[in-house]
Amino acid sequence: MVRFVPWNVPLYRRLETMAVAIYAMVLPVCLIMAFNLIVIPLFWGIAIPYLVWMFYFDTKHESGGRRVSLVRNSILWRYFRDYFPISLIINSNYDPKKNYIFAYHPHGIISIGAFCNFATNANNIDEKLPGLKVHLLTLESNFKIPFLRDVLMSFGMSSVSKKSCENILNSGAGESICLVVGGAEESLDARPGLNEITLKKRKGFIKLALVNGASLVPVYSFGENDIYDQVPNPRGSLVRKIQTKIKDLTGIAPPLFMGRGIFNYDFGLLPVRHKIVTVVGEPIDIPKIKSPTDQVIEHYHQIYVEALQNLFDKHKNSCADKETGNLKIN
């Protein structure tokens, strides 16, 4: 039986749900607007110059976006934060003269914790990391969608391309990036109670840190995998093979997930209410090596994996649900 939302839900909870619904509607609304812009002749006078500018002249998505404080500090994101709720724990001090790569785990279905903590100022990251400007990175393909690209850049978000990463890390003291290391593949392992990440073969971010002399910071979000359920898709199953094939062809993973609705608790595309605790570890200083060997990359990869495991073990009992399993690294 479907459980509907009662009529006497407090106003603040309705506002929290509204904030999450607005977040969920950004992509479809932008797609509808882009479609209308292109197919309706009335709008071509706007569409042609906008698309030319977007594809041939505007490269801000490769250099840190166009951060708008009004957007990042909006009260909307405070309600968004409180819906789950989402909290941020920072375990160290960071040198504002250095550049950092914050490596975020796990991906979850849509990296809610990464967005709230690194793209908005809902948990006061700007005050907790004084002197640092952290840019959350996302797929290059997201910046090919009219209007969506402008929304993303207003949060200071940028492309996850190599060029974008290096542009930001070399643009001045304190300029830093947040990478969701597991990517699309990891989203297929996101389900409640599991802490399964894709990391063993992910070494590009280690090389990026070495080439640019940026310090690495492990970040783990307890609860990121608990806000959506997902159709069973064990490795080797037909469902997983189809998902992997689509991911290989498009770069986008299609997890078959289910959350809740605006007016019910049992089905829909909104995430369920479940606390997310994002823990930021201590920085790992990395030497600047323009042409690191595979052995050097492997060495620092092992150091990073150990640091992430220690971070998880240290905070698991205090930040995660009792039924949460151990960290599994694929």
UniProtKB/Swiss-Prot annotation:
EC number(s) stated in the UniProt entry for this protein: 2.3.1.20, 2.3.1.76
Designated name of the protein: Diacylglycerol O-acyltransferase 2
GO biological process, one term: monoacylglycerol biosynthetic process
UniProt keyword Lipid biosynthesis present: yes
Domain of life according to the entry: Eukaryota
Transmembrane segments: 15-35, 37-57
Keywords: Acyltransferase, Endoplasmic reticulum, Glycerol metabolism, Lipid biosynthesis, Lipid metabolism, Membrane, Transferase, Transmembrane, Transmembrane helix
Pathway named in the protein's UniProt entry: Glycerolipid metabolism; triacylglycerol biosynthesis
Family of this protein: Belongs to the diacylglycerol acyltransferase family.
Membrane-related topology note: Multi-pass membrane protein
Main location: endoplasmic reticulum
GO MF annotation: an example: retinol O-fatty-acyltransferase activity
Pfam families listed in its UniProt record: DAGAT (PF03982)
Role noted for this protein: Catalyzes the terminal and only committed step in triacylglycerol synthesis by using diacylglycerol and fatty acyl CoA as substrates. Required for storage lipid synthesis.
Catalysed reactions, semicolon-separated: an acyl-CoA + a 1,2-diacyl-sn-glycerol = a triacyl-sn-glycerol + CoA; all-trans-retinol + an acyl-CoA = an all-trans-retinyl ester + CoA; 2-(9Z-octadecenoyl)-glycerol + (9Z)-octadecenoyl-CoA = 1,2-di-(9Z-octadecenoyl)-sn-glycerol + CoA; 1,2-di-(9Z-octadecenoyl)-sn-glycerol + (9Z)-octadecenoyl-CoA = 1,2,3-tri-(9Z-octadecenoyl)-glycerol + CoA
GO cellular component, one term: lipid droplet
Phylogenetic placement of the source organism: Eukaryota, Amoebozoa, Evosea, Eumycetozoa, Dictyostelia
Stored InterPro entries: DAGAT
Subcellular localization: Endoplasmic reticulum membrane
EC main group: transferase
This protein's record includes keyword Phosphoprotein: no
